[in-house]
Amino acid sequence: MAAAVLRDSTSVPVTAEAKLMGFTQGCVTFEDVAIYFSQEEWGLLDEAQRLLYRDVMLENFALITALVCWHGMEDEETPEQSVSVEGVPQVRTPEASPSTQKIQSCDMCVPFLTDILHLTDLPGQELYLTGACAVFHQDQKHHSAEKPLESDMDKASFVQCCLFHESGMPFTSSEVGKDFLAPLGILQPQAIANYEKPNKISKCEEAFHVGISHYKWSQCRRESSHKHTFFHPRVCTGKRLYESSKCGKACCCECSLVQLQRVHPGERPYECSECGKSFSQTSHLNDHRRIHTGERPYVCGQCGKSFSQRATLIKHHRVHTGERPYECGECGKSFSQSSNLIEHCRIHTGERPYECDECGKAFGSKSTLVRHQRTHTGEKPYECGECGKLFRQSFSLVVHQRIHTTARPYECGQCGKSFSLKCGLIQHQLIHSGARPFECDECGKSFSQRTTLNKHHKVHTAERPYVCGECGKAFMFKSKLVRHQRTHTGERPFECSECGKFFRQSYTLVEHQKIHTGLRPYDCGQCGKSFIQKSSLIQHQVVHTGERPYECGKCGKSFTQHSGLILHRKSHTVERPRDSSKCGKPYSPRSNIV
């Protein structure tokens, strides 16, 4: 976009130039609150983020316009001179009723605002300005360069400057100040009180803030790092009466100081009356209020789904279009949102900017950090509507709900086995392929799953970080500690729906339920005998092989089952038989137990 070029159509009298210096000294500049992007950074922003950028820039511009335009102006007529802007049509002022302020076009504000709108790459939008800035419309029937207009204007009209509306949504009187003008409300009473005599203007482009301050701004324009150019009012000399204690900047009046302090970084002056949450921008507060009201004004034309924010609707549209405009330069993977691409790129760079204050663990995305922090706080915000069970993650709730529906949408194409999770199917398919891609660096043993490898690593380190608070017993895995703690509490959370029997572990319940179904899925390849449990099949197969893998360390006797070895070991530890005082026959303590 070419920058707007200023052309001085008449000379400015010396008195006006001197008056300008008195007017502009100490004012806040648009550059102080502007936000810039490089070409590369701008390319990473999606449409929703560009809309947010537009909103922020327009609100900041409305603030600066109020600070610069009318403060310090003299109560006298403006000298006749004009400033025009190339490419910006002259605008005829709509007729206004006597009870309302008359409207006049603003050749100072229009170039700024059209530049900001062009940045968002949203063609076909029309710009509406109220108050001193009047109406800027693309319709040529409103333009009349041959008939210069005459109108009265007072300083208070600058309070109503720079209200933006999208095409097809013209403003109403009730909307003035609703969005971008809210931060300017403090100026209106002072402006009205300090001024009675209106300024007389004879031409559309001769409003006092157009004829003087715009002419001065053209002398200090500055190109930003972005491809577009903005004009920045800047004054480096002059007396400054009010100084900000936060940033040290000075203003020519107290009202300007109040406005300057509102745009300091980190400040959130706009508070929600419902919950007390505060925001830095009024537009953010308006979006937040819809949480309380339940308003969802943005509706998807494809599926009818509604949203509280326009940016969310824009992102949702990509679900239907399948658009993925953001591509990773490293691996070529594409994403529908730029934020997802930024998080993905951290996989390649190894960057982990989000750190947990509790344990110091770092993460690549803020959402992952939030989920992790719930392990410290114990928060479980997701509740099952069927059984009331709580979960830390929404994904865990979705998986859990399949227990109630018995849904297993992921089916193996080779054996027909189905799974409730896609990852479960992927892991199962490795059984058919025989792939074991995860290998232990210590012993060379390989595994089909990374989680199994991680568990195996603890065998080499002998690390047992999970200690029972009741008995002090340590475990390698947290899941085993949880199961162990049920022996102390007596908790049996898994209930059989057939007979009502309870179990401490879920897999024990699964094995038990096979009794009711009669299912014996584990068949012996030698004799065809079937078993309910896989462990029972393994024990049975020893009968055919003759293997006795369990050997006593004291006497060398071997056994086919581990339980047989345990029973045998007790024969080495029990006391020698003693004679009965009644019958004289020897007995052992174990034989005395009924």
UniProtKB/Swiss-Prot annotation:
Residues 569-594 are annotated as: Disordered. One of its GO terms (cellular component) is nucleus. The keyword Secreted does not apply. Belongs to the krueppel C2H2-type zinc-finger protein family. One of its GO terms (molecular function) is RNA polymerase II cis-regulatory region sequence-specific DNA binding. May be involved in transcriptional regulation. The gene is ZNF416. Keywords: DNA-binding, Metal-binding, Nucleus, Repeat, Transcription, Transcription regulation, Zinc, Zinc-finger. It is found in: Nucleus. Residues 28-111 form the KRAB domain. InterPro entries: KRAB, KRAB_dom_sf, Zinc_finger, Znf_C2H2_sf, Znf_C2H2_type. Residues 572-582 have a biased composition (Basic and acidic residues). Pfam families: KRAB (PF01352), zf-C2H2 (PF00096). One of its GO terms (biological process) is regulation of transcription by RNA polymerase II. A zinc finger (C2H2-type) spans 242-264, 270-292, 298-320, 326-348, 354-376, 382-404, 410-432, 438-460, 466-488, 494-516, 522-544, 550-572. This is Zinc finger protein 416.
